[in-house]
């Protein structure tokens, strides 16, 4: 089951990247990892650095995708984002945290993307 979930996650991230590129976002990094955690997609639009968490579901048994980006997950993403900003030497850059929900249909190739901009903030 873990392999299937990993495959679904990778597929969903690919769909999210294509969606972002189609909507004029420049992809800077994907699956950025360090000892603090991982960020799915890091992109830029105009002067804004956007940190994207991708969540997918093929049913609602476990709730909406965005519901899994709880407070603890948000804190983890923020820590990794701060470390990325320091690593890339991007001081004083404006940052936005987005969630992209990917709804998959296992019986067809249909899918739906819901892009939640500014899903959470640095506090």
From Swiss-Prot:
It comes from the Bacteria. Pfam families: UPF0102. One of its GO terms (molecular function) is nucleic acid binding. Disulfide bonds: none annotated. Belongs to the UPF0102 family. This is UPF0102 protein Cbei_1183. It comes from Clostridium beijerinckii (strain ATCC 51743 / NCIMB 8052). The lineage of its organism: Bacteria, Bacillati, Bacillota, Clostridia, Eubacteriales.
């Amino acid at each position: 089951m873990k392999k299937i979930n990993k495959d679904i996650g990778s597929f969903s991230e690919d769909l999210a990247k294509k969606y972002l590129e189609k909507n004029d976002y420049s992809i800077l990094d994907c699956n950025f990892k360090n000892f603090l955690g991982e960020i799915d997609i890091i992109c830029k639009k105009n002067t804004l650095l956007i940190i994207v968490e991708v969540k997918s579901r093929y049913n609602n048994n476990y709730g909406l995708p965005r519901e899994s980006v709880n407070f603890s997950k948000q804190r983890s993403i923020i820590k990794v984002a701060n470390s990325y900003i320091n690593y890339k030497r991007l001081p004083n850059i404006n940052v936005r945290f987005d969630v992209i929900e990917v709804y998959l249909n296992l019986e067809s190739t249909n899918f739906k993307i819901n892009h939640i901009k500014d899903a959470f903030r640095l506090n």
